[in-house]
């Protein structure tokens, strides 16, 4: 390459050339060239065709097949070609036998253009150990049950050809040496069997790609409708965002269990109604979780031990929150529970320490499981409905067995039931029971004072309706105005306030919108805080709004120019 004097243009001159035949240049195609023995076969006649070519099938390592073959030929390769390493099926056509095959677990029929069931997986689920390289047929519609199950030395990347609509249970289970990329065709509809009569209890040992070593992004085609149980279980090499197809209708148990390098946000498609047990447990998601309103059930540990952030919006039709569903995530903000919830399982929200505000349990809820909100230390208040029957504690879980164990931030509890719910011994372990008043119906004060669990609270008094939302206001040095909403059962008034705050109006009746004004202060002055106390008239019942103001060298909403430049 020479730069021309004057014009500055570049001139390219070819000084030499070297052309290497593709089959000899192993660098350019990742050393995939093989010295194949090429056999043209007829269905069921592979052994005969190899013999006719004067080849010893027991000594063949690299085999390319053309023509047509059937299940009998696959089982011959599986059971008799002991050192077969590389198999190229690119130009072959597979003819179905329409015969039932059964290995004691599954009963299947081999069809046209389908890699036969158990093709390289024999008795006792032993995969073919010698096989390490595979090219699938261009003309292919299906990969049968456990076709390559346990072929643990099958290596490199895997490309499923266009035209394939299903990859059945166990097709590539435990192919741990597949450490390249996985490419799925746009025609794919089912990952796992689409036969509804095929019970899912076999999925636990036959996830389609379970235990594979793929490394790269996982791109699931938009046409996929079903991902069966354990499909990508323990596929720890997949990384990046996971986009589930909009057409997806069904997910199986542990579909993506322990795919710990999947990150970003996750959106569950609208057609999904049930998220089964451990579906995404142990994944590395660090963005937000979006759940459609049509979901009615979320199974045990479905999203446990992920790292989701942001607010959690639960589906409005959700009825049961099972054990460990959102355990050990990083959700924040106020949690709104759907009105139809009846049970919250063990450790369902444990260790989501950024959940905050007042948590109100809907009427109809009956049980709150052991450790359900353990160590949600930013929760400030609880409101329990009349329907609540029990709040549980598991003594063998020393640090997180109580439903609200370690929730140190709780400073308000309201119980609406005339009959106290049964509270097990350590349900509120760590909650400061002498720092606030437990509010209960006036007619039930004596029952709560004598009830197990509730009697540990030092102050129990009648509950009245008086609340301010929001109950926290913060400002910088400049004057700050903020709207508050007062909900009261009757007339209310401002009982006290800091002299640097104003509330207008200062009294009202039932629901009222007021303006809180925090007056300006000198820049860099000491910070200050206080409480605005609202009181029901004629009752010794109050509610507080915490206010704080921070001295700062700049005012709120003030534009700051740190540096100016006119050039460069």
Where are the predicted features?
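Consensus positions within tandem repeat domains that build extended binding/scaffold surfaces
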Residues: 118, 144-149, 168-173, 206-208, ...
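Edge beta-strands of extracellular beta-sandwich domains
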Residues: 20-33, 541-550
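Surface-exposed binding patches on compact interaction domains or structured appendages
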Residues: 466, 487-515, 559
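A short beta-strand micro-motif common to beta-rich folds, especially ectodomain repeats
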Residues: 8-12, 526-538
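Beta-strand-rich extracellular modules
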Residues: 13-19, 519-521, 535-539
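Structural signature of tandem-repeat unit edges
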Residues: 35-41, 61-69, 84-99, 103-113, ...
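Short, solvent-exposed loop/turn segments enriched in Ser/Thr/Gly
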Residues: 477-484, 521-532
């Amino acid at each position: 390459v020479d730069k021309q004097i004057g014009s500055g243009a570049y001139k390219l001159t070819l000084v030499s050339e070297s052309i290497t035949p593709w089959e000899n240049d192993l660098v350019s195609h990742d050393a995939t060239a093989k010295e194949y023995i090429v056999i043209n076969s007829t269905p069921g006649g592979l052994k005969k065709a190899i013999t006719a070519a004067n080849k010893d099938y027991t000594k063949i390592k690299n085999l390319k097949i053309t023509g047509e073959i059937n299940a009998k030929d696959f089982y011959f390769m599986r059971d008799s070609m002991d050192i077969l390493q590389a198999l190229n099926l690119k130009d072959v056509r597979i003819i179905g036998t329409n015969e039932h095959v059964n290995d004691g677990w599954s009963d299947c029929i081999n069809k046209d253009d389908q890699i036969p069931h158990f093709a390289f997986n024999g008795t006792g689920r032993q995969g073919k150990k010698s096989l390490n390289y595979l090219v699938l047929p261009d003309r292919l519609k299906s990969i049968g049950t456990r076709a390559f199950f346990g072929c643990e030395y099958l290596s490199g990347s895997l490309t499923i050809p266009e035209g394939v609509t299903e990859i059945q249970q166990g097709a590539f289970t435990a192919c741990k040496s597949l450490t390249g990329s996985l490419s799925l065709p746009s025609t794919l509809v089912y990952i796992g069997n689409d036969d509804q009569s095929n019970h899912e209890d076999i999925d636990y040992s036959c996830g389609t790609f379970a235990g594979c070593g793929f490394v790269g992004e996982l791109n699931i085609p938009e046409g996929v409708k079903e991902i069966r149980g354990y499909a990508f279980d323990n596929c720890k090499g997949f990384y990046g965002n996971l986009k589930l197809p909009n057409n997806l209708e069904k997910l199986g148990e542990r579909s993506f269990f322990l795919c710990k390098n999947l990150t970003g946000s996750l959106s569950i498609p609208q057609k999904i109604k049930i998220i089964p047990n451990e579906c995404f447990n142990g994944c590395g998601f660090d963005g937000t979780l979006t759940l459609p309103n049509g979901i009615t059930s979320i199974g045990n540990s479905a999203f446990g031990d992920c790292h989701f952030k942001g607010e959690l919006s639960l589906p409005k039709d959700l009825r049961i929150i099972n054990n460990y569903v959102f355990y050990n995530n990083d959700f924040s903000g106020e949690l709104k529970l759907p009105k139809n919830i009846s049970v919250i399982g063990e450790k369902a929200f444990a260790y989501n320490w950024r959940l905050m505000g007042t948590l109100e349990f809907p009427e109809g809820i009956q049980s709150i499981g052991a450790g359900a909100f353990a160590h949600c230390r930013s929760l400030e208040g609880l409101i329990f409905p009349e329907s609540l029957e029990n709040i549980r504690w598991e003594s063998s879980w020393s640090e997180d067995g109580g439903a609200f164990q370690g929730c140190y931030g709780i400073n308000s509890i309201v119980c609406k039931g005339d009959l106290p719910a049964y509270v097990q011994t350590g349900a509120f372990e760590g909650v400061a029971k002498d720092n606030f008043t437990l509010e209960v119906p006036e007619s039930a004060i004596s029952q709560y004072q004598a009830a197990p669990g509730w009697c540990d609270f030092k102050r129990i008094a009648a509950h009245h309706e008086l609340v301010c939302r929001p109950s926290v206001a913060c400002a910088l040095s400049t004057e700050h105005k903020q709207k508050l909403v007062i909900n009261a059962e009757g007339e209310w008034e401002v009982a006290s306030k800091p002299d640097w705050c104003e509330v207008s109006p200062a009294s009202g009746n039932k629901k009222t919108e007021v303006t809180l004004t925090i007056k300006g202060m000198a820049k860099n002055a000491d910070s200050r805080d206080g409480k605005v106390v609202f009181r029901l008239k004629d009752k010794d019942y109050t509610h507080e709004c915490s206010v704080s103001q921070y001295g700062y060298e700049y005012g709120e909403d003030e534009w700051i120019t740190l540096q100016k430049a006119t050039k460069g």
